């Protein structure tokens, strides 16, 4: 959420702990509204996102079950290791009454890369470059275009999907080789690799 940008700027959450979910990606939709989706959630309650949003990356490589990287353990009890500085969604969540969280998500005040990089620009000289890289990458291989190709069955659609995947891989590799990005910043600046995204 935009309100949480200060927590990133203050260093509570390192940039490497943030991942970008791009418009067009398929994601779980557990709320009651449809502000974040292009279509009604279908099988497994997933739908394509209509807006970009930043979120804390989960621990491990698996999308489900997702586990917060800030969930720790003390004396056998689960504890939030950043409780005093937890993000708005975490402060809003109450497991037995999810309506406030659903309303928050419906409001749609999500932080995106452009906003975050603009906020970081004063103290991070590479923020403008990150914004340029994100825009160039999005223009060449958006998640929405990629999933349109994935849905197609023609030879042309399959060829276009393979082309987008190759470009995505090459763009990421070049960013790291030219030292424009550290590997752990790729999920924030460029989003997750297209070939690794969950599919409907």
Language-model regions, residue ranges each:
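Hydrophobic scaffolds flanking metal-cofactor catalytic centers in soluble metalloenzymes
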Residues: 1-154, 159-162, 170, 174-178, ...
């Amino acid at each position: 959420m935009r309100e949480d940008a200060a927590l990133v700027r203050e260093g509570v959450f390192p940039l490497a702990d943030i991942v970008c979910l791009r418009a067009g990606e398929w994601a779980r939709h557990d709320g009651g509204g449809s502000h974040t989706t292009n279509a009604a959630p279908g099988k497994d309650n997933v739908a394509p996102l209509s807006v970009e949003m930043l979120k804390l990356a989960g621990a491990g490589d698996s999308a489900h079950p997702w586990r917060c990287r800030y969930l720790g353990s003390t004396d056998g009890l689960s504890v939030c290791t950043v409780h005093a500085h937890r993000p708005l969604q975490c402060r809003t969540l109450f497991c037995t009454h999810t309506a406030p969280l659903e309303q928050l998500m419906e409001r749609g005040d999500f932080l995106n890369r452009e906003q975050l990089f603009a906020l970081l620009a004063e103290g991070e000289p590479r923020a403008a470059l990150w914004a340029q890289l994100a825009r160039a990458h999005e223009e060449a291989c958006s998640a929405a275009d990629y999933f349109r190709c994935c849905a197609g069955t023609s030879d042309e659609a399959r060829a276009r999907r393979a082309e987008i995947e190759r470009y995505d891989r090459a763009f990421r590799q070049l960013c790291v080789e030219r030292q424009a990005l550290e590997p752990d910043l790729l999920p924030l600046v460029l989003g997750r690799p297209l070939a690794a995204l969950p599919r409907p």
